[in-house]
């Protein structure tokens, strides 16, 4: 049976004390590395060394700025004997971005770690070794400069989980929604205007009757 922990459901502004959006799958897989990732993991009894795979949806800070803390914790604090490096699955250019972010935050502290203990994977589809999951990555509608994508996560049982990343309504989501057992949408802004790069409460009405969960919330708790 698959386990999905919502360890953060807030948007970039962390409304009502919600931590930044992040999920943990089967206590081995993270989707994104928000700035609050270390306390988020500790709240559910995990640490950075518990994680075998990280999937990055896009480059915005509330999804990637936890990278320095995560890597630092994994190297020094929660280090354990591991047979394989951490696998980080992301789009081309992401290795340079996260490396620059991490080494800029902690110069010399991560020397050798990011090249030797992290395996950077740019494939659009992959099997997540050591888990019961595989994924297909697909483009979504968000700030283009952040190279936004979602993930169709495929469990060996046949269960399909559609993680839409940060996105407004788009063909990529609609084309895959029909084969998903659960759809995770972000609902990052209220109904106060036109926001093509986010779902609003009015937008998600179109998913009524489908198995949908929401994250990146701006609504009060």
Regions found by a protein language model. Give the residues of each.
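A short alpha/beta connector and helix-capping loop motif
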Residues: 173-188
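Active-site metal-binding motif and surrounding structural segment of the metallo-beta-lactamase
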Residues: 36-87, 182
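Short, well-ordered alpha-helix to beta-strand connector turns
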Residues: 27, 51, 180, 209-211
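Metallo-beta-lactamase
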Residues: 83-147
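Core dinuclear metal-dependent hydrolase active-site scaffold
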Residues: 1-46, 119-175
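Short, conserved loop/helix-junction motifs that constitute active-site signature segments
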Residues: 80-82, 176-178, 205-211
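Charged helix-capping and loop-helix junction motifs
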Residues: 196-205
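Conserved small/polar residues in nucleotide/adenosyl-binding loops
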Residues: 215-221
């Amino acid at each position: 049976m698959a386990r999905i922990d919502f360890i953060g459901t807030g948007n970039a502004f962390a409304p009502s004390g919600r931590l930044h959006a992040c999920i943990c799958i089967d206590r081995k897989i993270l989707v994104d590395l928000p700035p609050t990732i270390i306390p988020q993991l500790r709240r559910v009894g995990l640490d950075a060394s518990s994680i075998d795979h990280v999937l990055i949806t896009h480059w915005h800070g509330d999804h990637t700025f936890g990278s320095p803390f995560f890597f630092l914790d994994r190297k020094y604090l929660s280090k354990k004997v591991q047979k394989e490096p951490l696998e980080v699955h992301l789009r081309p250019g992401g290795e340079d971005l996260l490396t620059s972010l991490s080494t800029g935050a902690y110069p010399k502290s991560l020397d050798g770690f990011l090249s030797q203990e992290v395996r950077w994977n740019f494939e659009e589809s992959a099997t997540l070794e050591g888990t019961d999951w595989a994924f297909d990555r697909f483009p979504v509608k968000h700030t283009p400069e952040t190279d936004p994508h979602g993930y169709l996560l495929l469990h060996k049982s046949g269960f399909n989980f559609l993680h839409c990343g940060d996105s407004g309504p788009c063909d990529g989501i609609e084309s895959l929604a029909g084969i998903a057992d659960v759809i995770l949408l972000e609902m990052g802004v209220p109904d106060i205007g036109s926001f093509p790069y986010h779902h609003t409460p009015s937008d998600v009405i179109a998913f009524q009757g489908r198995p949908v969960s929401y994250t990146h919330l701006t609504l009060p708790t």
